[in-house]
């Protein structure tokens, strides 16, 4: 029987151990999609206790606590931070089989040097030990990022954001590039309450009068230019339901005007607006050399009662089951036939779409940029051992795993970089197992080069992010 979480955790053979310890483990991290706060990074936010750094905003943990019968008072309610931590500690033993059990103990070990298992009995001791370390300094937001060997962090930012803290961080003595990620979801949701008010925010941010749809597009392009100047090289779109239809400005202009006058768009009109707007943005990304991320098939805010009480991103989302192949293919083709298809990363929250996405990527590779169209890493509910393995094997079966740009955290937590370790261990075990089974050659130099590429170098070449001078040496 193997000990829990030992040095060879998830590594089942000698080849995988060599690949991980000699090639993957020491590679820097390019975290090209996360939800960290640039303000907190700039201010090197400190944390008064373990609950603040670990449980605030972490809806993965919140879902597990609710499933374990924990009252909302001890999750998002008025209970003290220590009471909330105790409630989480009672839940942790019940998460065996869920990656939360692994992540929890990896984070305790890697950041705080605590090997004890967290449960109700160990909770007081762990609470005290971690809080002592947090109070002693060296555990601010920047410190935690640097401890994790991170080279680049890309945040998730609305087009109207000032990017004040990204700009300030450029001049800071901080060995990590913190870059903006362009997330124009509010520009797409024409029927969402507050759309017109958001357009006015866009007007202010761009310094441009928005009197019609053409002005709207110009203002969005203005903000893309602004993000580019701040180091932005990537966009992200949350597309809960993929839709696409051929249309043009003459059809969409009156739809935009209608909504700005307080009316709602019909489903057909909404599809036309989203199709043309996303197409326009795609051409802008291609002109700038950006990568476009599409996160597809999430079913969000399913409990209307709790959405009204707590708002979005609080643990009430699920996997959607929309068929995505035809509309996604039509959208990508609309850009490709105009030679305006940017580097694109496709994610689906539904694991049944793995083979669809892997095959679709191959339809639009251009023979110039290696892995131009990427099957994005396992996302959210698939951010598990099985989910990561399924995504990697699907990509390997149908595309080129060797050109994969690897892992991201997609997290609001400064402790989540252990997910990169988790991914790297699984990657090395997949490849190592092929070798042990005689399905791949025992060529450590070749395989090590592939592993280093997936862990770091492929993303570095793919995105071409600005790197601080001190990191180039």
Swiss-Prot record:
Pathway stated in the Swiss-Prot or TrEMBL entry: Carbohydrate metabolism; pentose and glucuronate interconversion
Keywords: Isomerase
Record-annotated disulphide pairs: none
Gene3D superfamilies: Metal-dependent hydrolases, uronate isomerase, domain 2, chain A
Top EC class for this record: isomerase
Pfam families, sorted: UxaC
InterPro entries, A to Z: Metal_Hydrolase, Uronate_isomerase
The UniProt record lists the keyword Disulfide bond: no
GO biological process: D-galacturonate catabolic process; D-glucuronate catabolic process
E.C. numbers: 5.3.1.12
Highest taxon above the source species: Bacteria
Family recorded in the similarity comment: Belongs to the metallo-dependent hydrolases superfamily. Uronate isomerase family.
Protein name per UniProt: Uronate isomerase
Name of the gene this protein is made from: uxaC
């Amino acid at each position: 029987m193997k000990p829990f979480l030992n040095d060879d955790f998830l590594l089942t053979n000698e080849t995988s151990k060599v690949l991980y310890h000699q090639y993957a483990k020491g590679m820097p991290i390019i975290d090209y999609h996360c939800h960290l706060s640039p303000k907190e990074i700039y201010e090197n936010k400190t944390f008064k206790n373990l609950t603040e750094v670990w449980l605030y905003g972490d809806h993965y943990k919140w879902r597990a606590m609710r499933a374990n019968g924990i009252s909302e008072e001890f999750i998002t309610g008025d209970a003290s931070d220590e009471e909330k931590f105790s409630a989480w500690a009672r839940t942790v033993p019940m998460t065996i089989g869920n990656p939360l059990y692994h992540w929890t103990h990896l984070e305790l070990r890697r950041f705080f040097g605590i090997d004890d298992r967290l449960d109700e009995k160990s909770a007081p001791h762990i609470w005290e030990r971690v809080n002592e370390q947090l109070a002693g300094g060296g555990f601010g937001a920047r410190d935690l990022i640097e401890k994790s060997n991170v080279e680049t962090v890309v945040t998730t930012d609305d087009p109207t954001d000032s990017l004040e803290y990204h700009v300030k961080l450029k001049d800071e003595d901080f060995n990590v590039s913190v870059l903006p990620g362009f997330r124009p979801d509010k520009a797409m949701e024409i029927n969402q309450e507050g759309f017109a008010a958001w357009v006015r925010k866009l007007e202010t941010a761009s310094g441009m009068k928005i009197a019609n749809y053409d002005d709207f597009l110009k203002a969005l392009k203005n903000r893309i230019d602004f993000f580019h100047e701040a180091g932005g090289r990537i966009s992200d779109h949350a597309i809960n339901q993929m839709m696409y239809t051929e249309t043009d400005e003459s059809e969409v202009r009156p739809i935009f005007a209608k909504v700005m006058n307080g009316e709602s768009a019909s489903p057909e009109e909404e599809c036309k607006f989203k199709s043309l707007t996303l197409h326009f943005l795609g051409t802008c990304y291609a002109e700038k050399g950006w990568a476009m991320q599409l996160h597809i098939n999430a079913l969000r805010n399913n409990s209307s009662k709790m959405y009204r009480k707590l708002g979005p991103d609080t643990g009430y989302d699920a996997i959607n089951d929309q068929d995505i192949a035809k509309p996604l293919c039509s959208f990508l083709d609309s850009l490709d036939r105009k030679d305006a298809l940017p580097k694109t990363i496709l994610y689906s929250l539904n694991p049944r779409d793995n083979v669809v996405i892997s095959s679709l990527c191959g339809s639009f590779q251009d023979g110039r940029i290696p892995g131009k169209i990427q099957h994005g890493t396992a996302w959210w509910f698939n951010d598990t051992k099985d989910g990561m393995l399924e995504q990697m094997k699907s990509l390997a079966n149908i595309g080129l795993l060797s050109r994969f740009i690897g892992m991201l955290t997609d997290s609001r937590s400064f402790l989540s970089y252990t997910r990169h370790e988790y991914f790297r261990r699984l990657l090395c075990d997949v490849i190592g197992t092929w070798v042990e089974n005689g399905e791949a050659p025992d060529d450590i130099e070749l395989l090590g080069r592939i592993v280093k590429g997936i862990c770091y170098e492929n993303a570095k070449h793919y995105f071409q992010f600005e790197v601080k001078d001190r990191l180039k040496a």
